[in-house]
């Protein structure tokens, strides 16, 4: 009877984007179009973060059904997970009961921009599959930087191309043709849809991802998987840039 109840609850909570492997062996999306997702992605990334996260506070942005939330909690972290979609949060809260994480995980319905109104800071920020859905990605990165104490794992949809280059401190108006170099940081704007999704707004190239990360005050430690970067909250921007960003944040967020 318990098995039938679980099957019914999984179906009622669907559709699922995260294929969770539940404690009794059931899977929430065994026929996922991407395969066993996000398990295969976790296997690529997990070796690049500490195996023991005891004492760490972690923020999972765009947590969906909570796959990464639960994996990070398994390593001992106290995880705050946010999403703006009540469907996914319903799945995540239900799944948390199956895994019995108790008070080690907390789910909040909120936008990434709402983080600026909280006093929370985090040792690790998990920022995967969200940036390209945001109309204001650099604003989001600026906010995230103010919440980060140690590390950030960032994944975003990207344009094809791996080229990067050493960027000059300044260029003249007459040198703008340099921006046509494939290695110059650039980001494609998606006015309509990509893969039938109206929330896919941006596709930066690798150089642009790394440049935006640096411009928000992170250091790029390395590319650890396809379209995925490990970043450190150690890069200090010049004071004049920090003051400018803070002023824009106050104006944009009303804080």
Language model segments and positions:
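Class I SAM-dependent methyltransferase Rossmann-like catalytic core
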Residues: 26-37
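Conserved alpha-helix/loop element of class I SAM-dependent methyltransferases that forms part
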Residues: 35-54
């Amino acid at each position: 009877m318990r098995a039938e109840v679980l099957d019914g609850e999984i179906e009622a909570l669907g559709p699922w984007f995260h294929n969770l492997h539940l404690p009794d062996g059931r899977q929430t999306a065994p026929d996922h179009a991407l395969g066993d997702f996000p398990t295969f992605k976790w296997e690529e990334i997990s070796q690049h973060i500490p195996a023991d996260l005891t004492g760490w506070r972690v923020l999972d942005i765009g947590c969906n059904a909570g796959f990464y939330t639960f994996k990070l909690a398994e390593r001992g972290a106290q995880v705050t997970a946010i999403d703006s979609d009540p469907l996914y949060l319903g799945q995540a809260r239900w799944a948390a009961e199956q895994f019995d994480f108790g008070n080690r995980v907390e789910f909040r319905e909120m936008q990434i921009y709402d983080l600026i109104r909280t006093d929370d800071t985090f040792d690790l920020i998990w920022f995967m599959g969200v940036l390209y859905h945001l109309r204001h990605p650099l604003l989001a990165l600026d906010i995230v930087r103010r919440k980060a104490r140690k590390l950030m794992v960032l994944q975003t949809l990207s344009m094809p191309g791996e080229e990067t280059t050493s960027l000059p401190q300044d260029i003249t108006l007459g040198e703008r043709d340099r921006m046509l170099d494939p290695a110059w940081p650039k980001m494609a704007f998606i006015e309509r849809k990509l893969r039938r999704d109206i929330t896919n707004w941006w596709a930066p190239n690798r150089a642009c991802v790394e440049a935006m990360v640096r411009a928000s005050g992170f250091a790029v430690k390395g590319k650890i998987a396809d379209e995925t970067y490990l970043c450190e909250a150690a890069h200090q921007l010049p004071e004049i840039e920090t003051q400018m960003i803070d002023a824009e944040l106050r104006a944009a967020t009303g804080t």
